[in-house]
């Protein structure tokens, strides 16, 4: 992106960068489209707000992407993000290195386990915690449609990780579920013992591994669900509750979570790289027993494997 788009500089590039022969050399240009703000979250977010409100202040449609450590977003400049919502901003906030355990070795100052709880408080912020690349692509594409084509006054908060792993091809027909908040990633067999496993973000991979362990070691079949947004599931549930309350003579509607799980057998277990409160917020609409695993507490400096064992969100829990 540096070579293609360039880093913005009002005076252009006044020197020859040392890495000029590299593919991603440090290219500065007075027409550059990347703002490199440095360790200045407040200034960077103000630049993002200026671009994300340009459609109304200057009549120019811009959809900015601001990438930052997720711990240093809502926690550090939450008041400015609230102002962005109040200003009807349109754009994408990308909380990188998200999750309490994905950023191994950097301790409690950098390991985020609650940004999605904070993002849920901003009414026009649509937030997602995807695991796979195709989920991210579907979310960004739909966000562009809503903000550019439909001119909706919403902005997106999406958490992404710095962990390397293989990404499968998209599940057939999964687009709607990705956007609404959850979809069936795989279905287990027809054994008598059955469980529903919900996973989000990087911990979804631990959930997939847990399903294998349950089948091979315990004779328990598991349906695996990818939950891209507990926040959107909660909002859907609240909307349905309100509609049912205001229309007592109509046929009651069912929340999307209920629609997904009502015909499935077994207890429901959710695991994320965030605090338990994140996945617990859909409890009212989960049929049957519901157990949540999360990363409550301060972050710690250790390897991912050890961190996930410590917070009890790995495949063995």
Regions found by a protein language model. Give the residues of each.
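Thiamine diphosphate
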Residues: 1-168, 175-177, 237-247, 260, ...
């Amino acid at each position: 992106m540096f070579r293609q788009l360039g880093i913005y500089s009002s005076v252009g590039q006044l020197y020859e960068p040392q890495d000029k022969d590299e593919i991603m050399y440090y290219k500065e240009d007075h027409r550059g489209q990347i703002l490199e703000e440095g360790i200045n979250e407040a200034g960077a977010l103000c630049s993002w707000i200026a671009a994300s409100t340009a459609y109304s202040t200057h009549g120019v449609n811009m959809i900015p992407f601001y990438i930052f450590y997720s711990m240093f977003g809502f926690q550090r400049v939450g008041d400015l993000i609230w102002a962005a919502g109040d200003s009807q901003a349109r754009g994408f906030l990308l909380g990188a290195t998200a999750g309490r355990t994905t950023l191994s070795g950097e301790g409690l100052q950098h390991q985020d386990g609650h940004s999605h709880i904070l993002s849920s408080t901003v009414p026009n912020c649509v937030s997602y915690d995807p695991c796979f690349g195709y989920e991210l692509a579907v979310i960004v594409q739909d966000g562009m449609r809503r903000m550019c084509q439909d001119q909706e006054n919403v902005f997106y908060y999406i958490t992404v990780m710095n962990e390397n792993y293989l990404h499968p091809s998209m599940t057939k027909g999964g687009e709607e579920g990705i956007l609404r908040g959850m979809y069936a990633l795989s279905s287990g067999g027809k054994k008598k013992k059955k469980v529903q496993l919900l996973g989000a973000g990087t911990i979804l991979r631990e959930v997939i591994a847990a399903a294998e362990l349950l089948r091979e070691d315990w004779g328990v079949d598991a349906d695996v669900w990818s939950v891209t947004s507990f926040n959107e599931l909660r909002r859907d549930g609240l909307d349905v509750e309100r509609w049912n309350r205001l229309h007592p003579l109509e046929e009651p509607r069912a929340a999307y979570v209920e629609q997904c799980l009502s015909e499935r057998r077994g207890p429901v277990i959710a695991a994320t790289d965030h605090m338990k409160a994140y996945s617990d917020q859909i409890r009212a609409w989960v049929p049957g027993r519901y157990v949540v695993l999360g990363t409550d507490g301060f972050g710690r400096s250790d390897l991912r494997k050890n961190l996930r064992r410590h917070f009890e969100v790995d495949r063995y829990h």
